[in-house]
């Protein structure tokens, strides 16, 4: 009897150790040692796409083994770049769908795009092309992209310093469209170099900007360019709230929230901030607001854009473009 019990226990142990699933963990031998080859070339699902109307495009390709891949889409006019990465033996809609957004500024234009598929461990480069008929449209309230110049409803102040240049310029460096606002100069007696006031009345005479009343849903976005060798610029945005609705901002009794941006990078960069995260600043230091202390995003009457620099730091320069409020999330250009 003891013999049979021992034998039964041994059989039970053997069966319990048997691997029920024949699937092999980790990469297959084909993926490890097999020769890489392209089974189906890179292709776009459509050869031209209208992102403005909601169209999308995706890319397909098939290779002989699982590989790390990088898909790069480059605008041949704008220089905009969108990248996607993955690890698989196939490129398909679920991994390569494109809605017209960019990974690196600038924003894509109406243009032809070159699509390149490369692999981490293979020399192959697959190429295709797709045409953007209409570029992606970003929803939100646009303060300015400067394509129509300087709005007559705005006001400005520019110090009488040296090499002052506050104006709308047009050149290929613009991250969106063809124009941007240039702010540059040397002021050796004051932090302020110049400013622009964006007034709500410049947009159809409205007493306040038409924004969601929930400050957690409102995002302020701006693209800022930092000049090489002049990383001393500070851009300060101030948001004046007309809390009592009398048509006037009263600094002593109403809130003004702010966002200070030290431009210490080179090139274009998108800055996004949720309105409820803004604070009141006094000489760059957070302080209690003077009004009700509530972020009334639907009561913003004026947005002030100041260009600042330490007066001992010399010439300062920044470029700004595509100032826009978005809802429920930051701008995805």
Q: What are these model-predicted stretches?
A:
Residues 137-138, 201, 206, 213-288, ...:
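Extracellular ligand-binding interfaces
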Residues 18-97, 101-112, 120-155, 333:
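Acidic/polar, low-complexity intrinsically disordered N-terminal segments immediately downstream
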Residues 23-28, 136, 142, 307-333:
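Extracellular polysaccharide-targeting segments
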Residues 112-119, 222, 272-317, 323:
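Extracellular beta-strand ligand-recognition surfaces/modules
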Residues 166-200:
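Short carbohydrate-recognition loop motifs
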Residues 84-88, 103-105, 205-212, 257-264, ...:
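Beta-strand-rich interaction surfaces with strong enrichment in secreted/lumenal proteins
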Residues 141-177:
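Compositionally biased low-complexity segments at domain edges in trafficked proteins
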Residues 13-16:
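C-terminal motif of bacterial Sec signal peptides marking the signal peptidase cleavage site
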């Amino acid at each position: 009897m003891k013999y049979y019990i021992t034998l039964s226990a041994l059989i039970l142990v053997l069966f319990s150790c048997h691997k029920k699933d024949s699937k092999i963990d980790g990469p297959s031998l084909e993926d490890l040692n097999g020769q890489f080859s392209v089974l189906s070339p890179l292709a776009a699902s459509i050869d031209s796409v209208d992102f403005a109307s909601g169209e999308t495009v995706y890319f397909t390709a098939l290779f002989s083994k699982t590989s790390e891949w990088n898909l790069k889409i480059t605008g041949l006019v704008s220089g905009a770049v969108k990248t996607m990465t993955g690890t698989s033996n196939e490129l398909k809609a679920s991994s390569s769908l494109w809605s017209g957004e960019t990974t690196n500024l600038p924003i894509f234009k109406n243009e032809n795009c070159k699509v390149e598929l490369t692999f981490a461990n293979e020399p192959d480069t697959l190429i295709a092309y797709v045409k953007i008929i209409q570029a992606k449209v970003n929803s939100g309230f646009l303060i300015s992209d400067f394509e129509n110049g300087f709005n007559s409803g705005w006001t400005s102040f520019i110090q009488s310093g040296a090499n002052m240049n506050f104006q709308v310029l047009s050149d290929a460096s613009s991250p969106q469209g063809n124009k941007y606002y240039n702010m540059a100069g040397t002021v050796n007696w004051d932090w302020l170099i110049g400013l622009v006031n964006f007034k709500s009345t410049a947009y159809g005479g409205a007493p306040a900007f038409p924004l969601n009343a929930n400050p957690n849903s409102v995002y302020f976005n701006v693209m800022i360019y930092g000049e090489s060798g002049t990383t001393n610029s500070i851009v300060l945005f101030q948001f004046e709230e007309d809390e009592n609705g009398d048509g006037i901002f009263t600094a002593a009794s109403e809130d003004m929230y702010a966002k200070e941006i030290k431009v210490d990078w080179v090139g274009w960069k998108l800055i996004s901030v949720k309105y409820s995260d803004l604070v009141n600043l006094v000489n760059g230091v957070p302080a209690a607001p003077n009004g009700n202390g509530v972020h009334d995003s639907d009561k913003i009457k004026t947005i002030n854009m100041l260009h600042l620099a330490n007066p001992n730091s010399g010439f300062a320069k920044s470029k700004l473009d595509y100032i826009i409020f978005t809802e429920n999330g930051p701008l995805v250009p």
